[in-house]
């Protein structure tokens, strides 16, 4: 079989991932909920995993790494942390339902930074115009899950920093596939699933949090 649906989930998982999952089910106890040996070992494994994620994505501290159920879970946390009810948000034209549905539930005014597909310069200009509306936040996917378009996230992040507007990045399609330098981008939040480009099991995700 030739598998072409990695935008949904990666399959099959590498042998090392399969072994790690089986070992965890056989030996891991409950992290953070006990002082016995197995619980302490689970704590240590969790800490090492957070540290590895911080190193991989250039996050200053492992304390800025939060594990979630998936990218949707992380995006909901980020959105509800920054967007007030009936607030104003700028988004790209490629956002997933994981972004649009919580914004709808909040009654947010959504301004779409619309630009032609595969047009980085016009995309940047669209975000620059949209920022004039003084939004509560900007939400932008790094890579479109439908078209595969890579958005100029570095330049969009620079615009947001210049306007002092918090940025939420959806890295669902890029984490593990494209380089991500969290420190250089300096977003408020960056969300990703564990089961796509990172080749982890479903039901896992990571939310990287800014220091502010």
Locations of the language-model features?
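Pyridoxal 5′-phosphate
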Residues: 1-212
């Amino acid at each position: 079989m030739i598998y072409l649906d990695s935008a949904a989930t990666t399959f099959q998982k590498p042998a090392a991932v399969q072994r790690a999952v089986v070992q965890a089910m056989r030996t891991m106890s409950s992290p953070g909920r006990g002082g016995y040996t197995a619980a302490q070992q689970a704590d240590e494994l969790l800490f090492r995993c957070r540290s590895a994620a911080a190193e991989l994505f250039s996050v200053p501290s492992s304390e800025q790494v939060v594990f979630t159920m998936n990218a949707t879970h992380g995006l909901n946390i980020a959105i509800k942390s920054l967007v007030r009810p009936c607030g104003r948000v700028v988004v790209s034209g490629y956002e997933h339902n994981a972004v649009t549905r919580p914004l709808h539930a909040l009654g947010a005014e959504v301004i779409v930074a619309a630009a032609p597909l595969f047009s980085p310069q016009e995309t940047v200009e669209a975000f620059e115009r949209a920022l004039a509306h003084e939004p509560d936040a900007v939400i932008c996917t790094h890579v479109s899950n439908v078209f595969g378009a890579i958005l100029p996230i570095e330049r969009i992040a620079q615009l947001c920093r210049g306007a002092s507007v918090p940025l939420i990045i959806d890295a669902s399609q890029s984490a593990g596939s494209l380089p991500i330098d969290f420190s250089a981008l300096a977003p408020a939040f960056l969300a990703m699933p564990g089961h796509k480009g990172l080749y982890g099991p479903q039901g896992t995700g990571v939310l990287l949090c800014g220091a502010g």
